Amino acid sequence: MALVLSRKPAILLENDGDYRQIIFEGKTVTKSLFADIENCAEFTKVTIPENVVGVRGDAFEEFVNLQEAEILGYVEGVERSLGTVATLDIDWKDPAVLAEHLRSGCYVEIKRAMSWRDWN
């Protein structure tokens, strides 16, 4: 399990194609859901409102190719890189720490270096 919502509205998951999925209050975002999106496009944008209250498990850490992913987010209204998973100083298994990073901006964009197609 990856994300837990406290109240409405929802998380919007989308790629640079036409694939979109809305996650409403109370639904848990699982690794398999991210894997479904990963199979659709190279870029996955996760729009996360400030109502995210916790992150459980290591679904982000184990997401395909996320070890090399660049994490982008808004900090004080300005988009900037938060680093890569390999170098980012975040305890991914600590819900409070990751949730605070998610709250620091409007979204976190998972940008993978290689597509799943590159491995096939």
Kindly label every feature range from the protein language model.
Residues 1-31, 40-54, 64-77, 83-120:
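Structural signature of tandem-repeat unit edges
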